């Protein structure tokens, strides 16, 4: 049995109808709503074939059909019509990015927030793992005679700050020299490789500049380890209540509980991320907790360096056309800003 043009048209109509109504689709209603140019009986036979082929399923309580994950996958890959002429707040997005955001985390949060507002789905931003990026600059700024503000900047624009306790008698000139030595040795080094750079010779060089500075080094290591913690930014979590799938309070609680599992969510996003934009649908997700949901994930890069991910998550009955069109437009604007901002 093959998927001919008629079967594809009927499958497309069923999926679009189910996305908009959340109700199982019957042959008679389908023939009334869509110009398929065949009788309800023919539609019914084609629907039976599509079910046998695994593209549709029949709920126990209904005579109608709903799409399977396999059906959604075919729809997204081959039948989906993106809204190429979609108009969203391009100038506002560019203005916000250019004027208000200097750190990658802020950019990811903003992207997640605007996508949640535009699509009415839950969105998740995942910051990159710090160990995968390179050090651009470390700055040490005196706060008082006992403390420094350490600012760590990566090549992808991540900025992390920490307060360091320092030995007494460390003057501004010594701090400046120490910063110069550290940057000279570590600039361009991958974060995960920095511990290996603190050889006995390098540590001795720092101690020569300031006796007791070796006590500061473990604190710097600790800061770098803390930077590698998973950072997720959620927006629109209550948007799930817009969908009838979550009228069941237990299902809604299960979804919200899943969002609290940072490791699970981060692995879901990483497993669904590819070049550009990608959708994972229902059973394609790697965890059973996410088998009833779809994720559309965008990967943000500067040159070839990944700086983060943003995912839109919702029921498999997701409005893929709107979601992927909106995400594509927002990503285009953000990438335009990234190219100018971090090069």
From Swiss-Prot:
UniProtKB keywords: Repressor, Stress response, Transcription, Transcription regulation
GO MF terms held by the record: DNA binding
One GO term (biological process): negative regulation of DNA-templated transcription
InterPro entries: GAF-like_dom_sf, HrcA, HrcA_C, WH-like_DNA-bd_sf, WH_DNA-bd_sf, WHTH_transcript_rep_HrcA_IDD
Keyword Transcription found: yes
Coiled coil: none
Domain of life of the native organism: Bacteria
Pfam families with a match to the protein in the record: HrcA
Presence of keyword Transcription regulation: yes
Summary of the function given for this chain in its UniProt record: Negative regulator of class I heat shock genes (grpE-dnaK-dnaJ and groELS operons). Prevents heat-shock induction of these operons.
HAMAP family (alphabetical): HrcA
Family to which this protein belongs: Belongs to the HrcA family.
Protein name per the record: Heat-inducible transcription repressor HrcA
UniProt source species: Alkaliphilus metalliredigens (strain QYMF)
Gene name of the encoded protein: hrcA
